[in-house]
Amino acid sequence: MAEKENVHPQVISSFPTPSKALKLSEKSSLKDVQTDNAAVPLVVDETSYPEPTCEFYGGLLGPQLPEAERFVLDPALVEEYRHKKPPFGFNGLGEVVYLRTYAREKDNGQSEVWLDTVQRVVTGTFEVLQHHVVNKLHCHWDAQKAKERSEDMFRRIFEMKFLPPGRGLWAMGSPICRKKGFAAALNNCAFVSTATLEKDRVGPFLFLMDASMLGVGVGFDNAGAGSFTVPGPDDTQPTYKFMIPDKREGWVESLKRLLKAHFCHTADVEFDYSKIREMGTKLKTFGGTSSGPGPLINLHKSIRKILVGEKGKPISVTCITDIMNLIGVCTVAGNIRRSAEIAFGEADCKEFLDLKSYETNPHRVEYGWASNNSIFAKVGMDYSDACERVRTNGEPGFAWLSNMQAFSRMNGKPDYRDQRVLGGNPCLEQSLESMELCCLVETFPDKHETLEDFKRTLYSALLYAKTVTLLPLHWRESNEIMLRNRRIGCSVSGIAQFITNRGLHELKTWLEEGYDILHQYDCQISEWLCIRQSIKLTSVKPSGTISLVAGATPGVHYPESCYYTRRLRMARDSPLLERLIKAGYHVEPCCVAPDVTAIVEFPVAAGNSIRTTRDITMWEQLSLAAFMQRYWADNQVSATITFDPETEGLHLNQALQYFQYQLKGISFLPRYPMGAFKQMPYEAITKEQYEEAIRKVKEDVSLSSANAIAETVEENQQTFCDNDRCIKL
């Protein structure tokens, strides 16, 4: 990847690569810098990162249209909704999650309110559509149809009948996309295979870091293990020093130089971190503050230590996963760049299965948590060894690659549409080729009175997701795949609520008719935009913060309790805290980091009649996942099955024997008593406790008038992986 011709100013391959010690880019210069040992040549990279040639979407969509012709959302529509109350969910929890996670800072320094965010997202979507039709296709733009479609999308997002992914709420129509051209920021997740390591020894690692620093969750495999012997740096050449530019590309370039030294037997490299801005410096485009050079320094030290020990050995499963996990730790530590990882390994590889055994691999305690680990299960295999491990800590998960390649929906009719698929994203709701990204969008069937209204929502949801596929990325290999596949993940959430209110059979009807109409819409939209129809359209994402905003149960998951306390972690200096206290919510210092983090408690009522995870067996949860895989998801269903280790753990092997023919992927989580640990994200309470807590909440206190965006504080305890690390830039 890194050696190919540049296709975009931001692409990795625009970096100069030293052949011998000191082959520099044309305008770079050499200086002697004294180190502890001797004078080391310094590579000063001053010209490798040109800015986009056009401020409008980084020049990706062509020149900006004349002002009189540009798409503008009807001001009358915006005014109509200005004083309408957004339907945030769960007694203020949804609004706080929105303000904390997705509301951007406006030019006047104030935080967006929901109306502002919806206006920005819809405007950004139709800007992309207009420029695709006018600039790329040179076709007629029907302003009246655009007005009708944009207004429908606006209403359905405002009313939370569907929502773009958290990344879309944060980035669509923002400077991240409009000025910088970082289209990857609108895509949720990706996958990269290491099978190419013999030919390209650094590319998969660079892709994962570059994508992670844009907030894209990345899955990876260990197919490249054993493909080459780690030679170590070339000691016959002098070590040189590289001054790291204060940009995302600079961080990735530093990793490239370090890995090339050890994997390709080139000159060793030392790093100068002096250009990286100090910790706490405000990040204007991406939001948040700089982490400083600390996480990158730790990454370099940790990887160097591992690779020195691997010299002369074939690259191993452990080495590949260690490097990927350390990159994940670095990007999570990088303040606002949150991301997630999943590692895939072979079912019979004991080395892979032992990666989360910290008795066997004590050195991995500090970073092994950075990925969920899943095995590529084979239909008909013996699951007993893996299931014993699942009983202990919930891993590994299971991915049936043969089912992913052979089936769309698991309805007994293989179509082999996706034979190039090699893995999936961190939550495993998307089948993906290597270096393929995906865009997800979330609908809420239970927020619709009629099936016909739900079908109309599906049009707007698909139009948003399809629009994201129009924006090329800065990876050539990814563009080649994504232009061919146009893969979409149109998801449904609040399934437990729908079943409770209308029944499973009604859900089956909505899913089947919704799936059929989506394919009709895809044909219409693809024809209008002169692009290919999507290879697959539907998924069930695990959801998380997005479902909290809308007040929906996440994906296919049932709530932990009818009444519970939901705790959020927030920065102690967040401007939201004062208003939350004034509004009557309980706030206390975090027991782990009391000086920097506060805990806010929200009383939540999931509903008297809804069943909870305590009422539903492991077998019923698996059956619901299989039901959704049969009637809705042609990609995959992301489901975490909770189970009682004592009463149900012994049945895991038998359960997988039955459901291996009905699923593409599944993960498990041992069930522990809620409240077993202090300040857990969820804690069951009684109806009386809920009513007492809710009486203290003052509805007349506005939370959205805080004048700045609250810092996001990561929640490692989140059950489902669609949390801050996965979806927030």
Curated annotation (Swiss-Prot):
Disulfide bonds join C189-C438. The keyword Hydrolase does not apply. Pfam families: RNR-II_ins_dom, RNR_Alpha. It catalyses: a 2'-deoxyribonucleoside 5'-triphosphate + [thioredoxin]-disulfide + H2O = a ribonucleoside 5'-triphosphate + [thioredoxin]-dithiol. It comes from the Eukaryota. It is an enzyme of class 1 (oxidoreductase). InterPro entries: RdRp_reductase_class-2, RNR-II_ins_dom, RNR_alpha_hel. CDD domains: RNR_II_monomer (cd01676). Monomer. Belongs to the class II ribonucleoside-triphosphate reductase family. This is Adenosylcobalamin-dependent ribonucleoside-triphosphate reductase. It comes from Euglena gracilis.
